[in-house]
C-alpha cells in the first residue's frame, strides 16, 4: 500500500507490476536524457555569441534529428506494446471472479462456485479497530489464492467505475453493459489495497478494494466455510 509522502511506486507483487515498474524507469531515463540535452543546448545558445549566420541548410543535421527521435520512439513503444500484450493475455485461469461496481460499493461473485457471492462496503471510521486503515478497510475482503492466474470480470450496475489495485498493476474500467477482464497473479501472500479510480459520485472516495492473497489450502478452507 502507499504511505504518506511516498515518492516511488508501491512494491510490485505481480509479474505485470514488475514489468510496469521497469518500463517506468526505462522511459523516465530516456526523458531525463532528452531534457538534459535540450537544457544544455538552450544554455549554450544563451551564453555564447557564436552564430552561423551563413548556414542555409544542413542535410546531415536534419537527417540525424529525424532518425534519432524515431529510434527513441521505437525504444519506448516496443516495451509498451509487450506489456499491453501481457496484460490482455489470459490462458487457463485457475479461478474466475466477477466484480460489479455500484454507488458506492463493490460486489463479488466467484463463478466457479454455485453460491459464493457477497457485497464489500467500506468500514466506517467509527467502527475501525486498532491497526485498521482509514478509508481502506472493507467488511468483506476478496480472498484469492496466490501464485495462480485469476481472471477478473469487471462491470458496473449504474455509472462508470474503475477497479484498481496499484501494487498488482491493475486498473480496469467498470462500464455499465460491458464486461472487461483483467488478470490477477500475486507472487506472495498479503493484503493489497485499492480504490475506485473513476469519479462516480459524491461517495467516490469511499469505495475501497481489499484483496487477501493466501496459499491455495487456506483459500479452499475459506471457500468451504463461505458456501
Curated annotation (Swiss-Prot):
Entry-linked CDD domains: CcO_II_C
Biological processes, Gene Ontology terms: ATP synthesis coupled electron transport
Pfam families: COX2 (PF00116), COX2_TM (PF02790)
Binding-site residues, Cu cation A1: 161, 196, 200, 207
Cellular component GO terms, alphabetical: mitochondrial inner membrane; respiratory chain complex IV
The family this protein is said to belong to: Belongs to the cytochrome c oxidase subunit 2 family.
Name of the molecule in the record: Cytochrome c oxidase subunit 2
Amino acid at each position: 500500500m502507499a504511505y504518506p509522502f511516498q515518492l516511488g511506486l508501491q512494491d510490485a507483487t505481480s509479474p505485470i507490476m514488475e514489468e510496469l515498474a521497469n518500463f517506468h524507469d526505462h522511459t523516465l531515463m530516456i526523458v531525463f536524457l532528452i531534457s538534459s540535452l535540450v537544457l544544455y543546448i538552450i544554455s549554450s545558445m544563451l551564453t555564447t555569441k557564436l552564430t552561423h549566420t551563413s548556414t542555409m541548410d544542413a542535410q546531415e543535421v536534419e537527417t540525424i534529428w529525424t532518425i534519432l527521435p524515431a529510434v527513441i520512439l521505437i525504444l519506448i513503444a516496443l516495451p509498451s506494446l509487450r506489456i499491453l500484450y501481457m496484460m490482455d493475455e489470459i490462458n487457463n485461469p485457475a479461478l474466475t471472479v466477477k466484480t460489479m461496481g455500484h454507488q458506492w460499493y463493490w460486489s463479488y461473485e466467484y463463478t466457479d462456485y454455485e453460491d459464493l457471492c457477497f457485497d464489500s462496503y467500506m468500514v466506517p471510521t467509527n467502527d475501525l479497530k486498532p491497526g485498521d486503515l482509514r478509508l481502506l478497510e472493507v467488511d468483506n475482503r476478496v480472498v484469492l489464492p496466490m501464485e495462480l492466474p485469476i481472471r477478473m470480470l469487471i462491470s458496473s450496475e449504474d455509472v462508470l467505475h474503475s477497479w484498481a489495485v496499484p501494487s498488482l498493476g491493475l486498473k480496469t474500467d467498470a462500464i455499465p453493459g460491458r464486461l472487461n477482464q483483467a488478470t490477477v497473479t500475486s507472487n506472495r501472500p498479503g493484503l493489497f489495497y485499492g480504490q475506485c479510480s473513476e469519479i462516480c459520485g459524491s461517495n467516490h472516495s469511499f469505495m475501497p478494494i481489499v484483496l487477501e492473497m493466501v496459499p491455495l489450502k487456506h483459500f479452499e478452507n475459506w471457500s468451504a466455510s463461505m458456501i
